[in-house]
Amino acid sequence: MGNRGVLIGSIVFVFGSFILMVSLLLYESYKANKMKALAASIKTEARSTSSSVPSMDYSMYKTKISDEGREMVQVPEGPFIMGSKDGDPDEVPERQTYLKAFYIDTKEVSQEDYARFAKMTKRPLPKIEVFEDDQSKLLRPEFAAMSMTWDEAVAYCKWAGKRLPTEAEWEKAGRGEGKRKYAWGDTFMSGRANANVDGSEDGFRYLAPPGSFETGRSPYGIYDMTGNVAEWVADSYDEHYYQKAPYRDPKGPEPGELKVVRGGSWRETQHNARLSKRFAAKLWRTDITIGFRCASDVEVVDSPTASK
């Protein structure tokens, strides 16, 4: 009986061990399948999230490379809505404006672009007058050019065979034919512009390289019309100009020392980042939040100056 008891005990032990091992294997298989299912659901969610921001096709709009090597897009002739009935007093009345076709830079002028111009024309680089942090954080070749006067922006565009856009051209390039508040629509969305309205959620503390926000492009595929640097335009500033502006191709009031700045900047509020928002600045002002881009008439052949 003693040996028989030992044998039975051994059989029970072996059988129990087998059952335990099978149970562990089944549990591990269950965990593995569950992890695979979780991974699959994460991938599906990621695809769903990315597909919620549809890829826009801008190929319908004609582009060209200007003489200084920068891409421009042709904004077609036609009407658009300018101003805002819900904005500041100088944005009213909201009205329809008609523009002939024009070209505009798809990206803001970079510091590298401006440095090339300054070197070829023997001009000094813009100086940063006031900045609370290390200036090197603003000075990178790939960042947007800033801190130049209105006259210096005009000189760059002339050197490149272009001009500054009019205020109306700038607004149409940003809004399209409708009256959207921001380049992508009516609701401000983090990650679509370098505008630190909610801290640094856009990924940049100060400036950003022009063209960093693919989902923040305007209806014509133009980058940074909302945020990064505000931009000089050709027009002088008149608070009441919209009330007397012509329907076709408005070019602003009589020249004066106050010029219009558009687009908001990297440190603006949602209100100031709106495409209809108008700013006024003395033409000799230099500011780390102000840069520019250039435009040209469709029928004008760019000057060869910049390619020499």
Label each residue range with its predicted role.
Residues 54-68:
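A short, compositionally biased domain-edge/stem linker segment
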Residues 39-40, 74, 306:
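Intrinsically disordered, low-complexity segments enriched in small/polar and acidic residues
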Residues 59-62, 89-93, 278-283:
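Short, P/G- and charge-enriched loop/turn segments at secondary-structure junctions
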Residues 27-56:
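Ser/Thr/Pro/Gly-rich low-complexity linker/stalk segments immediately outside membranes or between
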Residues 9, 64-128, 148-151, 227:
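A short glycine-rich, aromatic-capped structural motif
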Residues 1-15:
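N-terminal Sec-pathway targeting helices
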Residues 81, 86, 124, 131-279, ...:
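Functional-site microenvironments in short loops/helix caps that host divalent-cation chemistry
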Residues 288-302:
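Short, structured beta-strand segments at or near domain termini in extracellular proteins/domains
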